[in-house]
């Protein structure tokens, strides 16, 4: 049975779908000029992060590589390139601007990154939320893998999350789509991005833009107040404390203040006769 995948530019057609999987050979993973075709059952969403993470044959190294090279992958997305990655025994096909569809392995870029985040956090032994029991529990991953020292999340590093920080691999594009398994973490990280938006130089039109992706995932589970109660506000607060703990403030504002403090100490050591009018004017506001 043929299947069309709708994205912002039109649609991409695959020859067949079997057991929810599309064969990567049926879709050319390169830049494509899309022509519009009416998608089949585009309103049906077959994506399930939890289901994919229960798949066999993990290629965890690919997840680490993708987050490490996320800047290049994001540029490919911006250039409208379709990409494929062997995360499991089957390929994950990434189509820019993809709309929900009934395939579980043809996904948008943000959902793909969420899948990489989920795999890495499973590997790091993060607890997973059970919506039926309304509590966190151990994940079932038993994969044994030692990550390469060259692997790192550059975006997280720029936000002050060192490689040793628990949230180093979580702070990445698409983290909101891990809500099904890490709801408290997603809410807490969204709160962190909002409260540190100036330091992180996050571009936005309205403050609501900073939490909108999280809210979209949250409301799939129920009303905001009900879902917050299910997860537990105290649990969310603890996750926020984990996020800000031991984080290096790398924002330019903090660096600026640090430099000014150093300047003040240097000024004290300079002979007053060497402080010409120009430097005095520059340092006047600092001294005040």
Swiss-Prot record:
Keywords from UniProt, A to Z, are: Acetylation, Capsid protein, Virion
Domain of life where this protein originates: Viruses
**Where is this protein localized, as stated in its record?**
Virion
UniProt keyword Acetylation, yes or no? yes
Residues bearing the modification N-acetylalanine: 2
GO cellular component annotations, sorted alphabetically? viral capsid
Q: Give the record's family classification.
A: Belongs to the high plain virus capsid family.
Q: What protein name applies here?
A: Capsid protein
Species of origin reads High plains virus (isolate Kansas 2004)
